[in-house]
Amino acid sequence: MERFFESKPVVYMSKFIDMIMLNVIFLISCIPVFTIGAAWTAMYYTCVKVIRRDRGKVWQEYKHSFVVNFKAATGVWVILAVAEGVLAVLTFRLLVHGHGSLSAAVIGLAMAGFLFTLAMMIYAFAVLSRFTVNAKGTIQNAVFISIHHGGETVYMLVLTLGLATLIMMGWKFLPVILLIMPSAYMLLISLIMEKILIQYTPEEEEVASDDAGIDPEDMLYAEEHKDKPWYLE
């Protein structure tokens, strides 16, 4: 019986159910709108820890991240959402009413600003899910990382815009899309994001050296059995 529950089809089905459950919790968490930042942060945290690393339970880990990061995530969300909204409205108005080369240049700048702000959103909530930092520090880190990892930023922007396009084109199937896509999208993002975040994760302190009076054999045993944080596994 144990082999049955450990078989690949059963494991995959269990993960699929967890992803559906995570999507439902995420969508409910987004209803007040101002909580979207905390929900996004908790979604990323839970996807990586529970779905990818098999650590913890969906509801417990989601709730933990949502509560712990609520204040900073809400601040980041409000700032970036307002900026994104202003740039979107400006771009739309210029496309409808703008004429001439100057308008074209402004449209280009507005669109570039819109995409860069979107990139900051993608990075900001992932950073917040991993590190303890305030809203200002989160945005600063997101700006730095999005520029420093330009190739990965482009990939994740394409993925994000592709999902948005899918939602707009398949609006008739929106309930099904929303039930499946959020966690699937976050998992795809995490494949790139985790490789980036690990570069900024402080190394664990080494166990003790021989100079500290510890027997080398004991030190090797301690190193071998030392528990690593789940995100370093």
Stretches with model-predicted labels:
Residues 116-117:
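Faces of alpha-helical transmembrane segments in polytopic inner-membrane proteins
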Residues 1-97, 101-106, 110, 120-122, ...:
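Helix-coil boundary and N-terminal low-complexity module in membrane systems
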